[in-house]
UniProtKB/Swiss-Prot annotation:
Ribosomal protein is among the record's keywords: yes
PROSITE patterns: RIBOSOMAL_S11 (PS00054)
GO molecular function: rRNA binding; structural constituent of ribosome
GO CC aspect terms: ribonucleoprotein complex; ribosome
Role according to the record: Located on the platform of the 30S subunit, it bridges several disparate RNA helices of the 16S rRNA. Forms part of the Shine-Dalgarno cleft in the 70S ribosome.
NCBIfam families (alphabetical): PRK05309.1, uS11_bact
One family name in Pfam for this protein: Ribosomal_S11
Single biological process term from Gene Ontology: translation
Keywords: Ribonucleoprotein, Ribosomal protein, RNA-binding, rRNA-binding
HAMAP family the UniProt entry points to: Ribosomal_uS11 (MF_01310)
Gene: rpsK
InterPro entries xrefs: Ribosomal_uS11, Ribosomal_uS11_bac-type, Ribosomal_uS11_CS, Ribosomal_uS11_sf
Stated name of the protein: Small ribosomal subunit protein uS11
Length: 129
């Protein structure tokens, strides 16, 4: 019986100058996705993917490393300028933005897109430790 060849999707080298860096910073993790202006993903990374586990994922240093890795992925496609959208209340917001600048990307704009409820769902009860 002949085995069917498995086709894998090859990464295309896009030549993109401008893009958007989406930083989602929660209390437990930081996820950085860099897309082109249409929304197609060029590169992404998270604190967990970089190698941090447990409570270390929520640190600013983990966010810095994740942003660095995502920027390196995106710069292989020729990315130079980036607009930053930040979502969430986590500790890695500023560290991730600084890391994008240090990696060699020019930050044009920083926008906070944290969703704020107009008195929607009831929040979880307060923790008593």
């Amino acid at each position: 019986m002949a085995r069917r060849q498995v086709r894998t999707k090859r990464k295309d080298k896009k030549n993109v100058e401008q893009g958007v860096a989406h930083i989602k910073s929660t209390f437990n993790n930081t996820i950085v996705t860099i897309t082109d202006l249409k929304g197609n993903t060029l590169g992404w990374s998270s604190a967990g993917q970089v190698g941090f586990k447990g409570s270390r994922k929520s640190t600013p240093f983990a966010a810095q490393m994740a942003a660095e890795a995502a920027a390196k992925d995106a710069m292989e496609h020729g990315l130079k300028e980036v607009e930053v959208t930040v979502k969430g209340p986590g500790s890695g917001r500023e560290a991730a933005i600084r890391s994008l600048q240090a990696a060699g990307l020019e930050v044009n704009m920083i926008k906070d897109v944290t969703p704020i409820p107009h008195n929607g769902c009831r929040p979880p009860k307060r923790r008593r430790v």
